[in-house]
Amino acid sequence: MTKYALVGDVGGTNARLALCDIASGEISQAKTYSGLDYPSLEAVIRVYLEEHKVEVKDGCIAIACPITGDWVAMTNHTWAFSIAEMKKNLGFSHLEIINDFTAVSMAIPMLKKEHLIQFGGAEPVEGKPIAVYGAGTGLGVAHLVHVDKRWVSLPGEGGHVDFAPNSEEEGIILEILRAEIGHVSAERVLSGPGLVNLYRAIVKADNRLPENLKPKDITERALADSCTDCRRALSLFCVIMGRFGGNLALNLGTFGGVFIAGGIVPRFLEFFKASGFRAAFEDKGRFKEYVHDIPVYLIVHDNPGLLGSGAHLRQTLGHIL
């Protein structure tokens, strides 16, 4: 008889829940709930389990916020809870709450070739460190290392490191944004809101007034070639994504590969392929050759957060991935 665990991927607006086959890691019965419709995460879980008429005793939920102890307070939602209390209330034997990019990183060993698109570099070196990052509402970052037959995720808040410009244009962008918001982190330019910041700074640098555009507007106009400023913003976004990815590669010698997750890049895949991304990734001066062969992959799996939550839980329960 198949034994299932509950897995989840929770963001600021939606909670996606599914079942994970503990033996194989296969994800099934995925369903998305609007977080605004429920008073708590526990309430959503109860609804899901009731709808699917399944009894589970183990669970792992990935959440888009730092996890530092028993008390979890989401940064982009009103939900807050004690892990121990929720585990007790649900009658679970085991409940893990992990950072969303911990989950994405743990999905990588489970991905197949059809879940990846490669952008330059050679083959990954087995057993070497891996980096994963992704732009969405914010900028998530994690690393993954293989130790004693176990995958160990190294989460952090790498999206909030300083934005490090490396061209005259990027320097001007930094000056304009610093005057507006103070500290300019990488997330301030590599995210949905970050794309808007790039567009606005480009227009303001030319002493013009920017339109009130959303990320979707900028992407659509750039792809339609109907707005020079939007096209410049999207091009610069791709270049800065490359620089940032190259920095991650240098930090930990990620010869196992650098992986891009998040919902933004797939929306303009062909544009991204033709952009200056890879050149910027390798633009490391004296260490250009060091990063030259490091492969970069775009993750195109539908639910890496769910897949990785399942992988994390299965490994915790003693399975080898």
Swiss-Prot record:
Gene Ontology CC annotations of this record: cytosol
Cell compartment(s), UniProt: Cytoplasm
Coiled-coil residues: none
Which reactions is this enzyme annotated as catalysing? D-glucose + ATP = D-glucose 6-phosphate + ADP + H(+)
**Function recorded in the entry:** Not highly important in E.coli as glucose is transported into the cell by the PTS system already as glucose 6-phosphate.
Q: Which family does it belong to?
A: Belongs to the bacterial glucokinase family.
- Name-wise, this protein is Glucokinase
* Species assigned in the record: Escherichia coli O1:K1 / APEC
Report which gene this protein is encoded by.
glk
